[in-house]
Structure formats: structure tokens, C-alpha cells
Amino acid sequence: MESIEYKFAETLKSSELSLKQRQVLISSLKLFSEIGFENTTSNLIAEHAGVSEGTVFSYFKTKEGILDAILSRFLEQVIPEVIADFSDKRFAIGQETFSLFLRSIVQDRLVFIHNNKMQVKILLSRSLIDKSISEELGNIIVHSIINPITPVLNQFKKKWCYSRLVK
């Protein structure tokens, strides 16, 4: 299972951003994840990225601007790719039983969240502050998880033994 940080770096490779901009964004994500947004200074970002502090601000103006650039890339590319990888792997019709299907999904997502807890924390905490991020995240979840899982759930409903409900 690839990390969000790795996926983020991969999406930046195919972007129109300069090498220095990519270095600033990758370093910022790493630092925001490790020590928090509030504790990360522009000087730390510059040092970690191997650029001058002036370079950081010439590209992104503020730390908020850096975070916005990271989150927009997350919402446009990283999260949809991560969910698509998960959906392709977990939502295949023909699962053994509903309980095994459900258990595998929950276990997979718990491992994913554990492995990416700081990046998930950044995204979720920002979605509490910014309603547009929250709405976009909701749309991504509906289109990338709810819609693909519906046919699988319908298959389980067809096989469900209704007498188990009546007991």
C-alpha cells in the first residue's frame, strides 16, 4: 500500500511545477505531517527543501498558500487515486461473505489511516475549517466509494437470507 506522501510526490512529478516548487511542497507536507502546521516555519521548509527562504515565499507567498497548494493537489489527484486503488482492490463482485467483505474493508482502511495518520489529520482538520474542502471531500467519497460499492452491496442483498432478520 503506497503512502499518501509517495502518491503526492508522484503527482508532482507530472505537474507543471518547477523542481524547486516541488521540493518546497514535498518538504512542507513532510514537515506539516511530522511537527504540525503551526510548528513549521518558513525557514525550516527552506532548509528541508534545499532552497532559500525567499524562494519559498516567491512561489507561495504564505504558509497558508503552501498548505492550499498541497490540499488542492490532494483533492484533485491524490485522494481520488488512493480511493480508486482501494475501490479496484476491495469492491470486486464475488466476495465470499458480507462479514468477510466488511472486515476486509475496515481492516484495510484502518491500516491505511494508521500509515498515513498525519496526512489524514492535516486534511481532516483543514476540512473542519474550510467548508469548500469538506464539501469537495464529501463529493469525492460519494463518487469514488459510495457509487462503486453499491453494486457489491446489491449482490449481497440478493443473497441475504431474510429469515436471519426475523429471528
Each PLM stretch: what is its role?
Residues 12, 23, 31-65, 69-70:
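Helix-turn-helix
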Residues 42, 72-78, 83:
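Short, basic, alpha-helical segments at the C-terminal edge of helix-turn-helix-like DNA-binding modules
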Residues 34-38, 116, 159:
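Short coil/turn segments at alpha/beta junctions that flank glycine-rich nucleotide-binding fingerprints
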Residues 12, 135, 157-167:
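Hydrophobic/aromatic-rich alpha-helical bundle segments in the mid-to-C-terminal region
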Residues 100, 110-124, 131-158:
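Amphipathic alpha-helical packing segments from all-alpha helical-bundle domains
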Residues 69, 84-115:
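Hydrophobic alpha-helical connector segments
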Residues 1-19, 86-89:
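N-terminal intrinsically disordered/low-complexity leader segments
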Residues 37, 60, 124-130:
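Short helix-capping/turn signature of helix-turn-helix
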